[in-house]
Amino acid sequence: MAAACRSVKGLVALITGGASGLGLATAERLVGQGATAVLLDLPNSDGETQAKKLGKSCAFAPADVTSEKDVQAALTLAREKFGRVDVAVNCAGIAVASKTYNLKKSQAHTLEDFQRVINVNLIGTFNVIRLVAGEMGQNEPDQGGQRGVIINTASVAAFEGQVGQAAYSASKGGIVGMTLPIARDLAPMGIRVMTIAPGLFGTPLLTTLPDKVRNFLASQVPFPSRLGDPAEYAHLVQAIIENSFLNGEVIRLDGAIRMQP
C-alpha cells in the first residue's frame, strides 16, 4: 500500500500573496518544517525582505497573479533556483466593500471594482493553477503516483456573504465551485487540489482595526471566541500536503462561525 502521508520536508512550495498574512505564515511554517518556499507577491510588497528573513530556503518572485508572463517567470525562478515546484498555495486576494446599489447615495456598485476583485481573486487563482499544473506535470511521481498539491484560499463569504460583499463573495464562491472540477481535471496527472475557506483571521486587514471592532468580531466566533491565527491556517496547509487522500474538497476553518447579514 502506498504511504498515506508524506512529509513537507524537502518539498518546494510556490505561495502567492506570500509577503504577508496567511501566505507569509504558510511560508514560515513550511520553511520551518524543512521545505523551500518561493514568495510570489507584487513588486511593491514586502516580499523581498520577508524572503531574506527566511534565509536560503526562500526566494521572492515579484509578480501579479493575473499576468501569465509574471507567473511563468516565477515558475521559471522556482525551477532554476530549487529544481521544481511540488506545492502551490494561492493566498493572493483583495476585497472591496460596496453595496449592489446604495440608495442613500443613489449610486450603483461600479463594474470596475467588481471586475477588479474577480480578476485578482478568481481569475488570478485560476491563472496560477493552470500554469503551475504544467510545471508539476514534469515532476517524477512519488510512490503513490502524486506529482503535486494545489491549495486555494476561499472564504466563509463564499457561503454567507454579508452586505457589501457581492464582488468578494462571487470571487470566493467561484474558487469553491471550481475546486472539484479542477481536481478531476488534474487527477490523471497525479495533482491534488484543495481549498481552505477561512473565517475571521488576524491578518493585516483586521489587525489594523480598532480594538473595539476586533473584539466584537472575535465575539461572533462560537468557539474559540477569537480571531484565527494565521499560523493555524498554515498548519492546515501542512496537513493537507501531508495527507494524500484529501482531494477536491473545501475545508472551512472558522471556529463554527456563520456570518450574519
UniProtKB/Swiss-Prot annotation:
Question: Principal localization?
Answer: mitochondrion
- Which residues are listed for NAD(+) binding in this entry? S20, L22, D41, D64, V65, C91, Y168, K172, F201, T203
Please indicate if the UniProt record lists Mitochondrion as a keyword.
yes
Transmembrane stretches in the record are none
- Which residues are annotated with the PTM N6-acetyllysine? K53, K69, K99, K105, K212
Q: According to its UniProt record, in which pathway does this protein act?
A: Amino-acid degradation; L-isoleucine degradation; Lipid metabolism; fatty acid beta-oxidation; Steroid metabolism; Lipid metabolism; bile acid biosynthesis
Give the N6-succinyllysine positions (modified residues): K53, K212
Keyword NAD appears in the UniProt entry: yes
Residues binding substrate, per UniProt: S155
Instruction: Spell out the catalytic residues.
Output: Y168
Q: How does it assemble?
A: Homotetramer. Component of mitochondrial ribonuclease P, a complex composed of TRMT10C/MRPP1, HSD17B10/MRPP2 and PRORP/MRPP3. Interacts with TRMT10C/MRPP1; forming the MRPP1-MRPP2 subcomplex of the mitochondrial ribonuclease P complex.
Q: What is this protein called?
A: 3-hydroxyacyl-CoA dehydrogenase type-2
User: What organism, scientifically named, is this protein from?
Assistant: Bos taurus
Upper taxonomic lineage: Eukaryota, Metazoa, Chordata, Craniata, Vertebrata
- The gene name reads HSD17B10
